[in-house]
Amino acid sequence: MRPLNDYLNSFLFTELLRGLRLTARHMVFRRSITLEFPEERAPKSPRFRGHLALRRYPNGEERCIACKLCEAVCPALAITIDSHQRADGTRRTTRYDIDMFKCIYCGFCEESCPVDSIVLTRLDTFHMERRDERVADKQKLLAMGDKYESQLAADRAADAPYR
């Protein structure tokens, strides 16, 4: 009886059918977890590291004090800062450039900044139409910070207990 049973099992592919049933149970009849990307967005953490931005104080003055710590700590050497001394003795940046092709979005610049001037936003989809747009200058970074200031402030407040 055993040889006949083995012959019928191999002839009818019962092992194959059992494997296909298991595959169908786990693949076909499960709910899909894929997102339709342009229409649906995955939720992002307040610590998400996206596009860089420069922040301002509530009175409109830029926060950057030109200490150049972010430039020194950047492992990719993507940040370039030039500064000058003002009449009141404080330093301010005349040039603040970030090469977006070099930047690895590690967040070291954000961590090293003593006045929370440079921050990483939640913006994850950005593009450039020309190669010379890869360098984000001070005006572009300040505009990005102005645009997302409410979200940046909320993210900083949510992350405050862990800093």
Swiss-Prot record:
Subunit structure: NDH-1 is composed of 14 different subunits. Subunits NuoA, H, J, K, L, M, N constitute the membrane sector of the complex.
InterPro entries in UniProt: 4Fe4S_Fe-S-bd, 4Fe4S_Fe_S_CS, NADH_quinone_OxRdtase_chainI
Family matches, as Pfam families: Fer4_7 (PF12838)
Membrane topology: Peripheral membrane protein
Record has Iron as a keyword: yes
Residues bound to [4Fe-4S] cluster 2: 74, 103, 106, 109
Enzyme class: translocase
GO cellular component, one term: plasma membrane
NCBIfam families membership: NuoI, PRK05888.1-4
Domain (4Fe-4S ferredoxin-type) ranges: 54-84, 94-123
Function comment: NDH-1 shuttles electrons from NADH, via FMN and iron-sulfur (Fe-S) centers, to quinones in the respiratory chain. The immediate electron acceptor for the enzyme in this species is believed to be ubiquinone. Couples the redox reaction to proton translocation (for every two electrons transferred, four hydrogen ions are translocated across the cytoplasmic membrane), and thus conserves the redox energy in a proton gradient.
EC number(s) given by UniProt: 7.1.1.-
Annotated compartments: Cell inner membrane
HAMAP family the UniProt entry points to: NDH1_NuoI
Cofactor-binding details, from the entry: Binds 2 [4Fe-4S] clusters per subunit.
Positions with a binding annotation for [4Fe-4S] cluster 1: 64, 67, 70, 113
Keywords: 4Fe-4S, Cell inner membrane, Cell membrane, Iron, Iron-sulfur, Membrane, Metal-binding, NAD, Quinone, Repeat, Translocase, Ubiquinone
Cofactor: [4Fe-4S] cluster
Catalytic activity: a quinone + NADH + 5 H(+)(in) = a quinol + NAD(+) + 4 H(+)(out)
Descriptive protein name: NADH-quinone oxidoreductase subunit I
Keyword RNA-binding appears in the UniProt entry: no
